[in-house]
């Protein structure tokens, strides 16, 4: 998988079937063989290996499958269902194992990723299930403690992961294990839904608060969708009614619960659950807990001092789910903002996701944490949802919604998008297969784009915008190429009475300590930009690095707060570039001489 220098050989590492069934067979385990059909299909074409989205997916996938510090070995993953004290957080029984199984199973389903050891791991997990249906240490039915809430949390994540595996491989033993977890949850529901328990495990318990129970709704909704068993639906509905956003509580737990409510809506079609999520979205986006990066904190105010990759992934996925359910552009725009900024910034150069502290003006390097126990795996799980949202079909038209690399195959067309967006603002949509009749291709014009220039096979075409899209209908042929050129400019946004932030297209800009060391000192927040930018080209020489966004770089003159009579230059660049380099500090909110 790696060349002699240790670099990932992308062309050998992951192969993709163009949304046909995966072309790889997972190694079968006897424990899973009942009613299990092998994964097979036509040989798929190679996935574009230079796309911004796919490269980020591949970075985290490689970290999970082949990385270290720590390595996700079989023993390491199984530690939370035995449980054994091999690592941190094994009391969250099923948390790491469930996320690991779900993320890799979904990667196999969506991207066609070859994960040959997954079957054997799942078989070893399900045989560790307790007679009562749960995994882990002893559950205290009489009077649950924080340890019991942690066990519930982990079992909820494991239920979701096993069901995502079941979506990939219809294994009767796995579904039976999922039913046993569901039956355990139904058994404890009267106690867990009681006012006494809800009040006992308030926000002060944080990661072992009542969200450990409410997040069960995701697995229960999925279990109902698979089985049509009414008790699972009824319990999911009962949980939905007690979900609330408590001050200071755990954001990941709350957003996971909301994603479960969306899953309940998708499984039942009952619009009240969609309305609940829409109201929750309005509540979050109108609060101080919506960050300028498009993300959310780890804890709701007043416990909002750092971010968490799990919460960022949840926020992206919730917005994409709302977008799919409603096609309202505000949800897609919010997801886009978070994908290009908070989620990208949160991804470490190792491929991990985790925590970053934030201040009133920026994101210091101090306090950065790679949260391998949850965020890395939850971040990996987010990529398939993004990939499946790059395109969508509606009313016979194919829509290109997010300016990312992606692929879709529908009866009339098979297309893929390849991106040089970060370098020259362009996307190329290639037609791989086409039918014998005309097909409509609609391409979204995001709010940050001044215009979209479109050409087909090198010839410009003039298109008009309607409802946020430009449309092109013709009889397509294999090999046709549609090039989109997004017109972008730097925008200045007032973010406080005396401070501004800068963006270029979808990217939020910041000053990084790595290439502006003189800008950072004791009075950094008091530095003042002196004039409009001097240059829209990169002025700091650095080795070529992955995930760079040269199109967004800009340079300003500034007065150093500690010696203002000696002005200097500072380069601003996309904070998404953080993934391509060691962790460094960033300033995002600036004083200026003209505002």
Residue ranges and their predicted role:
Residues 1-16, 21:
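N-terminal secretory signal peptides
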Residues 142-149, 181-207:
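Asp-box/WD-like beta-propeller blade repeats and closely related beta-sheet repeat scaffolds
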Residues 31-33:
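Boundary at the C-terminal end of the N-terminal hydrophobic targeting segment
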Residues 449-474, 492-495:
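Solvent-exposed beta-strand/loop surfaces of large extracellular or lumenal domains
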Residues 441-442, 472-487:
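C-terminal beta-strand-rich structural cap/linker in extracellular carbohydrate-active enzymes
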Residues 236, 277, 332-430, 465, ...:
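C-terminal beta-rich recognition modules with glycine/proline-rich loops and embedded aromatic residues
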Residues 118-129:
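Carboxylate/His-rich catalytic cores and anion/metal-binding grooves
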Residues 35-116, 145-169, 210-231, 235, ...:
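Aromatic (Trp/Tyr) and acidic
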């Amino acid at each position: 998988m790696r060349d002699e220098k240790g670099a990932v050989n992308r062309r050998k590492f992951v192969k993709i079937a163009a949304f046909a069934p995966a072309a790889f067979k997972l190694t079968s385990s006897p424990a899973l063989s009942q009613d299990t059909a092998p994964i097979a299909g036509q040989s798929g074409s190679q996935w574009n290996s230079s796309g911004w989205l796919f490269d980020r997916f591949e970075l985290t996938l490689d970290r999970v499958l082949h990385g270290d510090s720590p390595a996700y070995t079989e023993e390491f993953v199984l530690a939370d269902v035995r449980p054994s004290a091999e690592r941190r957080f094994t009391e969250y029984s099923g948390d790491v194992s469930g996320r690991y199984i779900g993320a890799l199973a979904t990667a196999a389903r969506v991207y066609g990723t070859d994960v040959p050891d997954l079957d054997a791991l799942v078989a070893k997990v399900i045989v560790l299930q307790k007679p009562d249906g749960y995994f882990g240490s002893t559950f205290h039915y009489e009077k649950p403690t924080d340890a019991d809430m942690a066990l519930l949390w982990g079992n909820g994540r494991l239920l979701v992961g096993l069901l995502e595996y079941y979506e990939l491989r219809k294994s009767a033993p796995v579904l039976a294990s999922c039913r046993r977890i569901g039956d355990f949850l139904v058994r404890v529901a009267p106690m867990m839904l009681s006012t006494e328990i809800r009040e006992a495990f308030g926000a002060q318990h944080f990661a072992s608060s009542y969200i450990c129970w409410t997040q069960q709704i995701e697995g229960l909704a999925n279990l109902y969708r698979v089985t049509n068993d009414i008790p699972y639906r009824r319990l999911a509905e009962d949980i939905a009614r007690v979900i609330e956003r408590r001050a200071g509580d755990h954001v990941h737990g709350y957003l996971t619960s909301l994603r479960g409510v969306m899953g309940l809506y998708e499984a039942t079609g009952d619009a009240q659950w969609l309305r609940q999520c829409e109201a929750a979205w309005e509540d979050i986006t109108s609060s101080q807990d919506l960050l300028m990066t498009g993300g959310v904190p780890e804890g709701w105010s007043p416990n909002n001092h750092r971010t968490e990759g799990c919460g960022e992934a949840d926020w992206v996925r919730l917005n994409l789910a709302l977008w799919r359910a409603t096609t309202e552009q505000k949800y897609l725009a919010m997801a886009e903002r978070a994908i290009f900024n908070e989620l990208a910034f949160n991804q470490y150069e190792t491929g991990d996701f985790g925590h970053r502290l934030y201040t009133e003006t920026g994101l210091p390097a101090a306090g950065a944490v790679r949260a391998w126990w949850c965020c890395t795996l939850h971040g990996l799980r987010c990529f398939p949802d993004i990939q499946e949202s790059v395109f969508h079909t509606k009313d016979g038209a194919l829509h290109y919604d997010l300016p990312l690399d992606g692929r879709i195959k529908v009866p009339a067309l098979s297309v893929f998008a390849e991106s040089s967006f970060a370098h020259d603002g362009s996307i190329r949509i290639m037609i791989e297969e086409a039918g014998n009749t005309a097909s409509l291709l609609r391409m979204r014009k995001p709010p940050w784009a001044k215009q979209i220039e479109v050409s087909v096979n090198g010839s410009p075409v003039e298109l008009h915008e309607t409802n946020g899209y430009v449309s092109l209908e013709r009889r397509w042929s294999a090999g046709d190429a549609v090039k989109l050129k997004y017109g972008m400019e730097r925008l200045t946004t007032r973010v406080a009475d005396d401070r501004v932030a800068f963006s270029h297209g979808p990217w939020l800009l910041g000053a990084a300590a790595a290439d502006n060391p003189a800008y950072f000192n004791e009075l950094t927040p008091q530095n003042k930009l002196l004039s409009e930018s001097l240059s829209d080209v990169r002025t700091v020489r650095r080795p070529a690095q992955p995930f760079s966004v040269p199109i967004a770089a800009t340079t300003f003159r500034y007065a150093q707060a500690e010696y203002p009579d000696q002005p200097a230059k500072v380069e601003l660049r996309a904070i998404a570039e953080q993934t391509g380099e060691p962790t460094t500090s960033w300033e995002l909110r600036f004083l200026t001489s003209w505002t």
